[in-house]
């Protein structure tokens, strides 16, 4: 998501340190949300990640050191969190990373975005497979307003990654063509 936002904003020439650290923190928080709310899919959202990101548990270094341990977070999310803590010892560095990521996630504070991104009934895993009915997904974005471009870029990226997974399962070729227009 961090890369999608950078690309949609014309970024990519910025300092890779900040982008990488934002991505690492985002990965840790997504893992946190997936583990803590494993039985409640309605809370496995970017909006929930944003709430945690802007809490004292992330900004206050002393609280942050205990945050994942108190919630019994394990494996990759814990490793990513520890990597973040290792880099973000100073208030300025931590503020820069958290502030940059919060800016990129700000769209998930908008009620309309929360509503449409909270769940999906589109079976993207069926794209490119044999099926009885054709599937069409329309994504509209005005040329003059790039406000929601990061979310649209993320959706397209997710679809492309799923298409690669699907093709990998079927001898590196999709059973049905998929067109992006």
Model-derived segments and their meaning:
Residues 1-181:
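P-loop NTPase motor domains
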């Amino acid at each position: 998501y961090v890369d999608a936002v950078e690309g949609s904003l014309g970024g990519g020439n910025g300092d890779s340190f900040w982008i990488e650290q934002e991505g690492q923190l985002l990965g840790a928080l997504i893992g946190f949300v997936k583990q803590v709310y494993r039985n409640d899919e309605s809370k496995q959202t970017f909006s929930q990640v944003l709430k945690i990101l802007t809490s004292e548990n992330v900004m206050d270094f002393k609280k942050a050191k205990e945050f994942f341990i108190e919630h019994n977070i394990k494996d990759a999310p814990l490793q990513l969190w520890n990597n973040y803590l290792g880099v973000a010892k100073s208030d300025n560095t931590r503020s820069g990373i958290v502030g940059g990521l919060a800016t990129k996630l700000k769209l998930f504070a908008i009620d309309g975005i929360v509503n449409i991104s909270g769940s999906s009934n589109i079976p993207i895993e069926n794209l490119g497979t044999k099926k009885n009915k054709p599937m069409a997904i329309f994504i509209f974005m005005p040329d003059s307003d790039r406000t929601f471009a990061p979310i649209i870029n993320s959706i397209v990226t997710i679809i492309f990654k799923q298409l690669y997974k699907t093709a990998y399962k079927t001898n590196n070729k999709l059973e049905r063509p998929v067109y992006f227009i």
